[in-house]
Amino acid sequence: MIRARPRLAVRGLLLIENRLLLVNAWPDGKSDLLCAPGGGVEAGSSLPDNLIREFHEETGLTISVGEPCLVNEFHDPEGSFHQVDVYFRVGLIAGDPMAPWTDPEGVVTERRLVTRDELADLRVKPDSLAEIAWDGGIFYDPLEPILR
């Protein structure tokens, strides 16, 4: 099987009043999987610039980008998909994450703030998300199968 080159993406961890911002980026609610906001990297832009753009597209919020905190890899073992996500800690510059918001592109179906306890009852990726978001440090999650 011919494998495609890995897709590079960036994601941001935003904590507001000790709650983590997550999104469901599955149009029409095809999945209940939640993740940190972000998306694919465009050539010619820095990772932080890509994250600022993608975070705004998925949440309507403007952020500042801090230090990287995680490199996470996932793939489809039966296909050619392989993605590498670089996570950064981010801060809120503008916008209200608690206000109702609708994605004008219809990709993000949910944007919500969750506590660490609430996160334990949700389907999220990566598995180490709580540890990374609340405990600090820098992490690497080895290649894991994609969830849908």
Language-model region placement:
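Conserved N-terminal beta-strand and adjoining loop/helix that marks the start
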Residues: 1-21, 71, 89
